[in-house]
């Protein structure tokens, strides 16, 4: 990709984030085009893509036959098909799996590294972009297209925008915002996704979890009314038979080192510590606080105390901005 990522700065929590423009280099774009695009995606992902309008984007899962997620996808309509954003570390294997049945359909599935992914968040993000685009997305219309640019709106943890655009527009936006906005890399966007409770599936956790173990049902990413798709039987069983015993949690606190994706944590049990959970993502903020996204049992006590393995510091549960009640 010719557009150079911005240098990293320590990320900031959403409540204190100044206006910030981010390069989302740890995320990647992919597309499906062709006459059978909608039908094909409908048979592959957990969401009901046939009901998606041009104004919507949503988080869906692409599962294996056992209902375990290869990846989750931030999906939106694009040209005569769809585009999606996922972690760069899982894009190649996810596309390999998605293409397995494509020979029988009129579709072209491909990575897209021509376009650039940017994020805008922080203080008065909307006002900063209002000078640069004729229309901005909102709750009512979450996707807006203008020329070569697609803008996606996010409500949590605070209003922010994901911009999919060409290199020329990315350079223009950088030049226009450089004076007033801080520049940062994708760690800041990752910190915001963790705060928002959006599950982050990197390569270490691909093929490990059913969608409900990462709260996808609470984020509107699973349709239980649509026709069949790969892994549907297991995903449905988890709902209707109560087979899912896990959930995604947000922990904050201190740690002398950041846990890596796929690592477990330790839960305090009286005087002892017991291993628990699987870390999806973790970030250290500029104030020294550590935020961790972890899949654990869904019946954790809200006052539970955790730590990174053998660490002297502790982590506690923070509420997510959505409810898991069905």
Curated annotation (Swiss-Prot):
Major site of localization recorded for this protein: cytoplasm
Protein keywords: Cytoplasm, Folate-binding, tRNA processing
GO cellular component: cytoplasm
Localization per record: Cytoplasm
Residues the entry annotates as binding folate: 27, 189
GO biological process assignments: iron-sulfur cluster assembly; RNA modification; tRNA processing
InterPro entries, per database record: GCV_T_N, GcvT/YgfZ_C, tRNA-modifying_YgfZ, YgfZ/GcvT, YgfZ/GcvT_CS, YgfZ_barrel
Function: Folate-binding protein involved in regulating the level of ATP-DnaA and in the modification of some tRNAs. It is probably a key factor in regulatory networks that act via tRNA modification, such as initiation of chromosomal replication.
PANTHER family in UniProt: TRANSFERASE CAF17, MITOCHONDRIAL-RELATED (PTHR22602:SF0)
Protein name: tRNA-modifying protein YgfZ
Organism listed in the record: Escherichia coli O6:K15:H31 (strain 536 / UPEC)
């Amino acid at each position: 990709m010719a557009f150079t990522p911005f240098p990293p700065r320590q990320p900031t929590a959403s409540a204190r984030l100044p206006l910030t423009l981010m390069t989302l280099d740890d995320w990647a774009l992919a597309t499906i085009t062709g006459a059978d695009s909608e039908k094909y995606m409908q048979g592959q992902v957990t969401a009901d893509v046939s009901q998606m309008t041009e104004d919507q984007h949503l988080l869906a899962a692409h599962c294996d036959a056992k209902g375990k997620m290869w990846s989750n996808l931030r999906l939106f309509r694009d040209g005569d098909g769809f585009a999606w954003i996922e972690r760069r570390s899982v894009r190649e294997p996810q596309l390999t799996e998605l293409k397995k049945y494509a020979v029988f359909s009129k579709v072209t599935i491909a990575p897209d590294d021509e376009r650039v992914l940017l994020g805008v968040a922080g203080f008065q993000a909307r006002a900063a972009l209002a000078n640069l685009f004729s229309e901005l997305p909102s709750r009512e219309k979450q996707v807006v297209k203008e020329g070569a640019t697609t803008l996606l709106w996010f409500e949590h943890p605070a209003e922010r925008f994901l911009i999919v655009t060409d290199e020329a527009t990315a350079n223009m936006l950088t030049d226009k915002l450089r004076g007033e906005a801080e520049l940062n890399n994708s760690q800041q966007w990752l910190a915001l996704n963790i705060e928002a409770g959006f599950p982050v599936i990197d390569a270490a956790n691909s093929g490990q979890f059913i969608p409900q173990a990462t709260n996808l049902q609470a984020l509107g990413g699973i349709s239980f009314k649509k026709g069949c798709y790969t892994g549907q039987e297991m995903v449905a069983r988890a709902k209707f038979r109560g087979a899912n015993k896990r959930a995604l949690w947000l922990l904050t606190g201190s740690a002398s080192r950041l846990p890596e994706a796929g690592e477990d944590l330790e839960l305090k049990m009286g005087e002892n510590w017991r291993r628990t959970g699987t870390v999806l993502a973790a970030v250290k903020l500029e104030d020294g606080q550590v935020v961790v996204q972890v899949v654990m049992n869904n019946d954790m006590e809200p006052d539970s105390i955790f730590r990174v393995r053998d660490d002297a510091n502790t982590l506690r549960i923070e509420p997510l901005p959505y409810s898991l009640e069905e």
